Amino acid sequence: MNSSLKDKLAVLPDKPGCYLMKNASGEIIYVGKAKVLKNRVRSYFTGSHNGKTQLLVSEIVDFEYIVVSSAIEALILECNLIKEHDPRYNVMLRDDKTYPYIKITNEAQPRLEITRKVLKDKAKYFGPYPNAGDASEVKKLLDRLYPLRKCRNMPKQVCLYYHLGQCLAPCVYEVSAEENQRLVDQISQFLDGGHEEMKQTLTEKMLQAAENMEFERAKEYRDQIKSIEAVMEKQKITFTDTIDRDIIGFAVEKGWMCIQVFYMRKGKMIERQTTSFPYYGSETEDFMSYVSQFYYDKQNALPKEILLPQESEPELLAEWLGIKVHAPKRGKKHELVKMATENARIALQEKFALMSKDDARTVQAVHNLGHILGIPVPHRIEAFDNSNIQGTEPVSAMIVFTDGRPDKKEYRKFKIKTVEGPDDYGSMREVVRRRYSRLLKENQPMPDLIVIDGGKGQISAAMDVLENELGLYIPVCGLAKDEKHRTAQLMYGDPPEPVNLRRDSYEFYLLQRIQDEVHRFVITFHRQSRTKTMLSSQLDEIPGIGEKRRKLLFSHFGSLKKMREATVEDFRQLGIGDKLAKEIIGHLRKLDT
């Protein structure tokens, strides 16, 4: 077992959930569920196993997990994940078994039934339930509490249910549409989480019956309360509306933010994405900035609905994307956002726990990297990456790692000035020239190693500037990526050649962290620059708006949308006259039409 796996096992949460085992290629080879993740996942790596399980364990090099709030949710999520990923070590349900739902039929005299098919028949569906027995228990409870029609075919006389007070007998007596709708609404509210209100009502009736010494009646109420508690554990993993939706939650701690995106497709949660990064502004603003960037390049693959935490601002995102974006305050959707947020919080805790364990290994990895490259220990590493879209708004960025740790105060951003069009080599030459000619001029210490995001061409461009223009001999290596844009190969030498470095080594992990961090930093800078240019250009078209006023307007209003919705009076407090205010409002509203 590798040391990284040991560290992850040490910080597993004491909660229910699903785990996804991965092999060396990152392929999900097994999905399982657990009442207690910590105990179940650790059990794979302790004690003896049968031949089949031992074969599975021998292939596991990594895992991830999703925390839920109950064993039932874990069961249903496991089914969804298995069907989505088709792990080769899982026993698949070849008959494509589906879970049962409770249905309120769309009839003049509606009734309750159990079904395994969700149809577009204007009926109401609730579930799924882990098995037919649980669904049947819920239906029996509802049958006792709400007197909807019970018989599939209308009899000619009242049945026993009527005499028990469990049916209004529409077969004999007239039951209005209003009365039926009232019962349907009550059942819907009950199944959507309103059963706590029914429990409270039954509790009051139980206490009153006991006070009146009607002990049999009190016992009946008590049994009904127990039935509700036994069968109404909320399930958040599946919806019945088959809508594609993304659920996003976030958590912050120690200057880091973790964002979890749960993908629900056709009503089933099938995948999640976890991203952690240091943040520098306000929590909400940086979160919404990430979400906006997340969907920036996904206009053709958007879900029908996005669910966000309450502290976010969904209106602007909804206007931009043209889809439903909500910050639910209650109900099932709110519970899903809470689950995403809880998973983000746990992921951050795991991250910090692992970071606290890898200090010694990180320092050792720095020493080993120097040995592998045949250079002195690279205590200070500077890494570069470029970003542009078809040559527009080209930028570059540099990050610094000191003894294997990011040194954020040393990060630098560069706007490319001398290169036109999509010339990555030219951009690399310019930024290396600007960076190290300045260090020479200011007599600042040079880095021990330069890391370039790219292959032979980028490395050669950087080395040419350093050696032939500046007379500097600093080791330069490059990190090439594979077709999935993942760190794949370390390049070094003159000419640059691949370096034999195991992908599961801590040295490779260190380089991967450096590449991911510089890429994140430059992409964020590029998007900020591009967004600023796009927003600024709309105001620049208005006579009388210069850079100073533009900054003042954005500082006060925060967005073009709020400027567009403002009144002339709102501009006066900024010292902007009525005439110019009207021009601003009119111009922005014209652009919006």
From Swiss-Prot:
One function term, GO molecular function aspect: DNA binding
Keywords, ordered alphabetically: Cytoplasm, DNA damage, DNA excision, DNA repair, Excision nuclease, SOS response
SUPFAM superfamilies named in the record: C-terminal UvrC-binding domain of UvrB, GIY-YIG endonuclease, RuvA domain 2-like
GO BP, sorted A to Z: nucleotide-excision repair; SOS response
Main subcellular location of this protein, as a coarse class: cytoplasm
Domain GIY-YIG: 14-91
Name the UniProt record assigns to this protein: UvrABC system protein C
Organism: Brevibacillus brevis (strain 47 / JCM 6285 / NBRC 100599)
